[in-house]
């Protein structure tokens, strides 16, 4: 069974059919590319797969579960993470806190546990810090963990966005032009 099965997917904005009758099957453990000219609808497809846009036709099935039209939070919890063409970080938050945002969809403690900062909250926060630092180290961002995200150079901001997406522990990772705007050295470092 495919990890992701897309059938007859489409979306129209008013009278403009942006994507029509897209069929796609993605197997677990493989690398795929969605290639096309500017304006072909690649980002629109990513937006439908992640719940940013609701398709006007078709189905999206992830790991046997229909996720068509679900909101982005539920789709993220189901196992799809993404990056964006234009970097979308929390610029005034620290680098480590940006990664921890991705970890929060896996952490389970009640509202009162968090408000009162009970031992379970402190334990989970410590665990998230450890996991976030592991990811930052992989992307050579661990030394900048306490910087504001906006203080990082562009190439490192790209890496941070990928680290945050990976923090969700996705089944499927969608990278929307991950090297856009990067110089050749930054691109090579990313690969």
Residue ranges of predicted features:
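Glycine-rich phosphate-binding loops of nucleotide-dependent enzymes
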Residues: 2-191
């Amino acid at each position: 069974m495919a990890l992701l099965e897309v059938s007859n997917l489409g979306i129209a904005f008013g009278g403009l059919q942006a994507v029509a009758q897209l069929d796609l099957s993605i197997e677990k453990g493989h690398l795929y590319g969605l290639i096309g000219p500017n304006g072909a609808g690649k980002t629109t497809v990513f937006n439908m797969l992640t719940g940013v846009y609701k398709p006007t036709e078709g189905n999206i099935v992830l790991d046997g579960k229909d996720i068509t039209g679900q909101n982005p939070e539920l789709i993220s919890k189901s196992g799809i993470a993404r990056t964006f063409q234009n970097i979308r970080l929390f610029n005034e938050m620290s680098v480590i806190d940006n990664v921890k945002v991705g970890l929060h969809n896996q952490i389970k403690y009640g509202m009162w546990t968090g408000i009162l900062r009970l031992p379970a909250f402190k334990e989970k926060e410590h665990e998230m810090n450890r996991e976030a630092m592991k990811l930052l180290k992989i992307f050579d961002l661990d030394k900048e963990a306490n910087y504001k995200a906006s203080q990082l150079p562009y190439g490192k901001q790209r890496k941070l966005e990928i680290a945050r997406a990976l923090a969700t522990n996705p089944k499927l990772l969608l990278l929307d032009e991950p090297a856009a705007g990067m110089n050749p050295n930054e691109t090579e470092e990313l690969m």
